[in-house]
Amino acid sequence: MSGPWPSPDSRTKGTVAWLAEVLLWVGGSVVLSSEWQLGPLVERCMGAMQEGMQMVKLRGGSKGLVRFYYLDEHRSCIRWRPSRKNEKAKISIDSIQEVSEGRQSEVFQRYPDGSFDPNCCFSIYHGSHRESLDLVSTSSEVARTWVTGLRYLMAGISDEDSLARRQRTRDQWLKQTFDEADKNGDGSLSIGEVLQLLHKLNVNLPRQRVKQMFREADTDDHQGTLGFEEFCAFYKMMSTRRDLYLLMLTYSNHKDHLDAASLQRFLQVEQKMAGVTLESCQDIIEQFEPCPENKSKGLLGIDGFTNYTRSPAGDIFNPEHHHVHQDMTQPLSHYFITSSHNTYLVGDQLMSQSRVDMYAWVLQAGCRCVEVDCWDGPDGEPIVHHGYTLTSKILFKDVIETINKYAFIKNEYPVILSIENHCSVIQQKKMAQYLTDILGDKLDLSSVSSEDATTLPSPQMLKGKILVKGKKLPANISEDAEEGEVSDEDSADEIDDDCKLLNGDASTNRKRVENTAKRKLDSLIKESKIRDCEDPNNFSVSTLSPSGKLGRKSKAEEDVESGEDAGASRRNGRLVVGSFSRRKKKGSKLKKAASVEEGDEGQDSPGGQSRGATRQKKTMKLSRALSDLVKYTKSVATHDIEMEAASSWQVSSFSETKAHQILQQKPAQYLRFNQQQLSRIYPSSYRVDSSNYNPQPFWNAGCQMVALNYQSEGRMLQLNRAKFSANGGCGYVLKPGCMCQGVFNPNSEDPLPGQLKKQLVLRIISGQQLPKPRDSMLGDRGEIIDPFVEVEIIGLPVDCSREQTRVVDDNGFNPTWEETLVFMVHMPEIALVRFLVWDHDPIGRDFIGQRTLAFSSMMPGYRHVYLEGMEEASIFVHVAVSDISGKVKQALGLKGLFLRGPKPGSLDSHAAGRPPARPSVSQRILRRTASAPTKSQKPGRRGFPELVLGTRDTGSKGVADDVVPPGPGPAPEAPAQEGPGSGSPRDTRPLSTQRPLPPLCSLETIAEEPAPGPGPPPPAAVPTSSSQGRPPYPTGPGANVASPLEDTEEPRDSRPRPCNGEGAGGAYERAPGSQTDGRSQPRTLGHLPVIRRVKSEGQVPTEPLGGWRPLAAPFPAPAVYSDATGSDPLWQRLEPCGHRDSVSSSSSMSSSDTVIDLSLPSLGLGRSRENLAGAHMGRLPPRPHSASAARPDLPPVTKSKSNPNLRATGQRPPIPDELQPRSLAPRMAGLPFRPPWGCLSLVGVQDCPVAAKSKSLGDLTADDFAPSFEGGSRRLSHSLGLPGGTRRVSGPGVRRDTLTEQLRWLTVFQQAGDITSPTSLGPAGEGVAGGPGFVRRSSSRSHSRVRAIASRARQAQERQQRLQGLGRQGPPEEERGTPEGACSVGHEGSVDAPAPSKGALGPASAAAENLVLLRL
């Protein structure tokens, strides 16, 4: 044997000591010699650790605690006893960052030398904040055993792949859950312990169901207890995913397994994966399928499919982004660089500790720019601390040694050392010596010429190098001079601006320094009191623009998250200006104590005037040795960002307050400034609590180094992590190309005109194992949570938005939301997506967890979003991203005035936000009505963007069915309509596909906007309009051109198809008689229909803005369409029929409620009746049947208070008698029988003059149903549009006109092969019978009140009919009034041949049957 390794004989002496020497600790990994098999030796260490040893835990400043430490049986965590934390007294091996030997930690440094034997001491650094567990063992052998064993375990964890880590984590979580549930420690769980565990896991199951699963899992002679293996089987039964099972059925042709071909289709169509082969799918089956029988047959069952989707392959984060994938050869100024502020501090800015460990932590966390504040120390040794405060001090030498050790452990990209130099020239030379001696070759000392200062080097060129950022002597100083004067105005040390000593040294001014620090601390305390009284959240630093206006801000209401910063920039119309010393000058309305203001400006002190004079010529002495170490990162003072930079090798530092002023006043110039050189942003000096500001506005302006306080975990640090995780966490993220070249205004409403935007469609499907809030008072014994999900987009101000789902009551284990959220993003390259889970509470909401990631890091398809810091908690979503062209605007309506959120506030809010606002007026009113949205329904949200043009999916396959080709060009923009007729802003959103829904619809919303009806193809003509100088819309064949789409499954006809009356030419003519004014807007062919959100995800396209109509179109009601993202093809195929006539995804997944659209047809009011009557019948195309279409032979229903969505017709002139229903007999005589999709009659204005009021099905009485009998079979029909209902023949006394005949003809006739009709999609005869029954909704209204209102309505209608019957031949028709709020769904009607009515009326006086309108 050769080499430095000892002989096997020598191993008998001090085996553990020898093993520790072999295990070389290099940056968190273990380097082993391939010549040695160390398994038995390591096992001895593991055995000794599992047996446990007594050691002393040091806390610093007090006596140590004697505890018994041991490694648990799964080797997953270190535990100790005794402890008041009970089962929580543990440190996970996964959380350990480093194990160091000897007295190296800051805690050991507090004890005098000689207190402990260094060979018996070691420290364990763990957690996100690098907390240290400092232990003293009884002997050096014990210390070596623990250090060796822990390093070995850490090495194994670092080497395992992500899949093995996820499976190991799950196994450990199951074992830990089992142990914690085993209260009596007998190794098994009783039914009582299981019920307690289910409550802890937020599972709300009936006891009988739990007992049944318990009996099924209890397989060992049914002893009434569950062992660990039985518990795993029980948990597996309990956690079977219905959503994944339905998803699997879709792609397996309704089988309970997926073969390789089906799995390949799923990965290609849904997950948008390229290059998927059958061999790779077979490998997935082999890897994830737990059942040996399925594995041998090459099948993936539900368990294997669940394992795959919950593996890293199903995570929302792109696995390629775990590694560096961006171009790293661009100049440094083209990258965002993660930076730390006052890196050495572990707490606040005034009195906390300074530790060298913080440098090790932030560098290993990916930070590439650290700050070192250098001051003169005793004995000629420079020290590091926060100047003029009471923070502790550490040696500059120790800091540099730590940086040298940990700088390039995680990656080799350059580290920038930001030195804030306050030392004398003598100690500056000492600093330069330490930097040169310790860093050595890592220090970039390459000889570069100032002539090359036009371009910065790239991160790739500077790999493994440390750059010193600091002041540099000017070129006009002699090279022989060892020192020189430089400006001190570029200092980024904020607090010394108020505290810098003018005369004397620190010893003579010690009292003044302490007073300044105490005054700052006092201001912090008083500010906290003001926050508590004036606002529940912290203030934020903000500035006013010169005009005094806020301008465009981002979110004012941030979320109160656990452990996050708190604050808001605007409350109740007040702007809190975050500068203590400048509140009076800014005109703040909050009255602060005078002591906070005094002294900061130094106006009352004798030195205040001299200080102001000194600032005009603030200079300092700089050593030549230290100056020569600065190459590419020279610190300079910047007074005007519009001036051309003299060199790119310089860095300008701005406080957040100054940077905000620049952002508000000169955003485009600031962006250009950051293209030429580096800039660094640091927190305000008044963030003495080490809170963080929002970094996103500065990233929007291209600022490279946005320094944050890494010791303050919270929202802002989470945004920072998400930003830099997009490139492997290397600390460098490439800026978008538009930020590196060209100029744009990041604060404008359309920052990049002409460029494609992204539409993000997120379907929040379900959640898994969501825990109780961490700060819950009752802990695991608290109530089962009521979760909802909030999604936030953080980017440019125009992109910042948030949406949220409804609340699911009493289910945190597997809640199902099935809701679709849509976002528009102008610049996705810098946008972040933030998922938050909240627990709804009557008095607020509690934070459960979050996950933030870059927009570019999201994977499409069905993905799991694992909450940060939680082992099993996740939400299941579907992600779809499309390209959007055209302008985007918010659709506003009357409901939006009540339900939309507060006006966005300042982007600079450094806090998670404030508690949610009180319910709006409309929400409080609606809660008191019978049909009000309940707690389980979706809260009010802002409107979805309303699109002018279509979408184009960025995916290749699988989405071709779900898109609408964009139009040929931008359409004229119409003003937003507000009022009762417009929908709620949260209810309208762009539609990416048009697909008919089945007759089963929801009773949730009544949409009223008519869509363009079918019309004949007119000759190509260009509509002209002089209104406001609008350009004519393109017509002719070119106007109907659509971008080609790829079909994935079903073949489609590539020829243009008429849709909503659009002919081949696609030309539209404006309706004769309509006025050319601002209210009349042209319709466009490329207009994307706007849909209305309902609970079950049914969408109804509304009429595009404007007054243009197809030639001679009779205004039929639109068909019901579904959203591609809200109702994907896979859900449409879940019904046994297998056709498109299936319910939408959320109907099948989350709700049995149905939606009916009662879009009322416009009968041409305001149009020329002669023009309508003269339209030739033969030119009218067929009208598709629709469950939502009302019979157009009846006039519209009057608007009611309880249903403001219906269009108000009270302002219209009365309808003449010629618009009464006409007989269908002449036209029906020669027509073949066709099964209708469904018809629903509406009571007209003349029939029901009294405003109808809302009533749910649960309130109907027997009097509300008028039975009629079908001829032959005498089948009972409740006269509500059920199958079997017959139509009465109009008597001879009813006048006929062309308009009514056209409307009747469109209602009953349907052209064969018309693909726009829902009935043409199914086989012949389908849908005639067997439709679903009524869906009844409970209500709190009394039946007696309903009868009284129905009686009044009936009497009023009878009076109206008597008046109408005066001009008729024969007795008036006897009809019922509309009961208040009656609702019904005409699932499937029948159009039989005319037959005599069997009602009370005689044949001669029979009129058209008016069915009861049942609506919410």
Curated annotation (Swiss-Prot):
Entry annotation: catalytic residues: 341, 385
C2 domain: residues covered: 740-869
Residues at which Ca(2+) 2 binds: 342, 371, 373, 420
Residues with Phosphoserine modification: 487, 491, 595, 605
Domain of life assignment: Eukaryota
Residues of the EF-hand domain: 169-204, 205-241
Keyword annotations from UniProtKB, A to Z: Calcium, Cell membrane, Cytoplasm, Hydrolase, Lipid degradation, Lipid metabolism, Membrane, Metal-binding, Phosphoprotein, Repeat, Transducer
Regulation: Activity is stimulated by GNB1:GNG2.
Region called Necessary for plasma membrane localization, residue ranges: 1-155
Listed cofactors: Ca(2+)
All copies of domain PH, residue ranges: 47-155
Protein name per its UniProtKB record: 1-phosphatidylinositol 4,5-bisphosphate phosphodiesterase eta-2
